[in-house]
């Protein structure tokens, strides 16, 4: 998905305006492919929005059949259910990026300023605390 999304961002000349808006403080929550789009580095060298001090590894959790649910601690929230669908993970964090959640030693959520990324899909559970965390970040409460 991130490859197609990145291609469309380029073809539709959206990369530069979106990068500019992010640089100007636009809050962004990148889920799964969005994590890859926001990363400054990726395992395959493809960089799109170049916004977060993270390195993303795409399709790290395998194919669709490798999708799974697990519980993990999310910083500032506590234990939550995390749903992974052919998910990436974060292999490196530097600069201002902060790790928020890890599963089996792999980083699956991070933030930097008003940017939040998750390798998992919080919208596939009934728990809205991760979305609430993003809203708190926007308001400056977190």
Annotated model-derived regions:
Residues 89-142:
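C-terminal and late-domain segments of enzyme folds
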Residues 24-25, 52, 113:
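Structured helix-beta-strand junction loops
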Residues 42-106:
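Pocket-forming structural segment of enzyme catalytic cores
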Residues 31, 85, 126:
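A conserved hydrophobic position in a structured secondary element of the catalytic/binding core
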């Amino acid at each position: 998905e991130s490859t197609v999304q990145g291609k469309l961002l380029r073809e539709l000349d959206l990369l530069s305006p979106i990068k500019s808006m992010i640089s100007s403080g636009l809050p962004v929550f990148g889920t799964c492919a969005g994590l890859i789009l926001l990363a400054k580095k990726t395992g395959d060298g493809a960089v799109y929005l170049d916004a977060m001090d993270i390195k993303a590894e795409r399709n790290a959790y395998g194919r669709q059949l490798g999708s799974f649910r697990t519980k993990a601690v999310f910083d500032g929230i506590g234990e939550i259910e995390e749903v992974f669908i052919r998910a990436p993970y974060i292999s490196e964090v530097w600069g201002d990026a902060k790790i928020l959640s890890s599963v089996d030693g792999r980083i699956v959520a991070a933030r930097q300023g008003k940017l939040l990324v998750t390798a998992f899909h919080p919208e596939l559970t009934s728990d809205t605390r991760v979305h609430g965390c993003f809203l708190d970040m926007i308001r400056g409460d977190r």
